[in-house]
C-alpha cells in the first residue's frame, strides 16, 4: 500500500513529458496547418524535421553556444527560455521544455514565427536536403 501511495504522489508531483517519435505518415496529419504557410509545402517540412530531429519530439542538441529543442529544433538563444540561457530574447514567449512533448501546437506557433522572421533557411537542413525531389517525403497512405 505504501508503494502505491508513493507511486501516486510521484506521478502527481512529477508528470511525465509525453514524448513522441513520429513517422513520416503521422506528421502530415498533425502538421496540416503548416501546409503552404510561408510558401512551404508539407513534404518540405517533413524532410526538414527528419533531418533536424529525426521526428523525435525529445531531441535536444547543443549547438554554437545554444541549445535547440524538439521536433523543429528551436533555439534557446532567441526563441524560447530555459535555465541555461537567461539572456534569451524568448521571442515565442515560451519555456523551451514545452517543445519536448507530443503536443505540437506551441511548436507550430513558434515555427511559424521563425519562418516569418528568418525564412525556411533558419533550418539549415532545408536548402541542401529538402528544397527539391520531395516525392520521398510524401506518405503513400494519404
Swiss-Prot record:
Query: A Pfam family name for this chain?
Result: Lys
* Binding residue positions for Ca(2+): 98, 101, 103, 106-107
Question: Which residues are connected by disulfide bridges in this protein?
Answer: 25-139, 47-130, 80-96, 92-110
A single Gene Ontology biological process assigned to it is: defense response to Gram-negative bacterium
Q: Which residues form the signal peptide?
A: 1-19
Gene Ontology MF terms in the entry? calcium ion binding; lactose synthase activity; lysozyme activity
Cellular localization per UniProt: Secreted
**GO cellular component term of the entry, any:** extracellular region
| Tissues where the protein occurs | Mammary gland specific. Secreted in milk.
Q: What range(s) does the C-type lysozyme domain occupy?
A: 20-142
* Coiled-coil zones: none
Per UniProt, the keywords (alphabetical) are: Calcium, Disulfide bond, Lactose biosynthesis, Metal-binding, Milk protein, Secreted, Signal
Assembly with partners or alone: Lactose synthase (LS) is a heterodimer of a catalytic component, beta1,4-galactosyltransferase (beta4Gal-T1) and a regulatory component, alpha-lactalbumin (LA).
Q: Which family does it belong to?
A: Belongs to the glycosyl hydrolase 22 family.
The UniProt entry, under PANTHER family, shows: ALPHA-LACTALBUMIN (PTHR11407:SF32), LYSOZYME C (PTHR11407)
Role description: Regulatory subunit of lactose synthase, changes the substrate specificity of galactosyltransferase in the mammary gland making glucose a good acceptor substrate for this enzyme. This enables LS to synthesize lactose, the major carbohydrate component of milk. In other tissues, galactosyltransferase transfers galactose onto the N-acetylglucosamine of the oligosaccharide chains in glycoproteins.
Protein name as it appears in the record: Alpha-lactalbumin
